[in-house]
């Protein structure tokens, strides 16, 4: 997809390796099933506690979510801009999608759902 192509071009090979490694480590930590992760890659997020843990783990590793569970808006925008190559678009997504839910896991899940509404292929196989 175009979005994934842009993501690959905007991120260095080192970035991609780190994301894949982080995703693998988080999968081990969260226990999320491969089936649920495959669906998530396609933009189909199941309301699954292990998937939520997976997303939170990745967001923490990318420093998008603080230890407190709150979204780090500046870091979130910076990471998005590296993928979108569009500062204005990233700003709009951050403003719209920076939410705080009852738990850090729910926050990561809802942020992901929000981003995927506008960009269904945004995360591709890089982030989950």
Curated annotation (Swiss-Prot):
The record describes the protein's role as: May be a carrier protein for lipids.
Instruction: Give the molecular function GO annotations.
Output: odorant binding
Intrachain disulfide bonds: 26-57, 97-114
Q: How is it modified after translation?
A: N-glycosylated.
| Major location category of this protein | secreted
Leader sequence residues: 1-10
Q: Which organism is it from?
A: Tenebrio molitor (Yellow mealworm beetle)
Q: What processes in GO biological process is this protein linked to? A: sensory perception of smell
Record key words, sorted: Disulfide bond, Glycoprotein, Secreted, Signal
User: What is the similarity comment for this entry?
Assistant: Belongs to the PBP/GOBP family.
Name the organs or tissues of expression. Tubular accessory sex gland.
Gene Ontology cellular-component annotations: extracellular space
> Could you tell me where this protein is found in the cell?
Secreted
Recorded protein name is B2 protein
Q: Please name the Pfam families in this protein's record.
A: PBP_GOBP
Under the heading SUPFAM superfamilies, the entry gives:
Insect pheromone/odorant-binding proteins
Q: Which sequence ranges are marked TM in the entry?
A: none
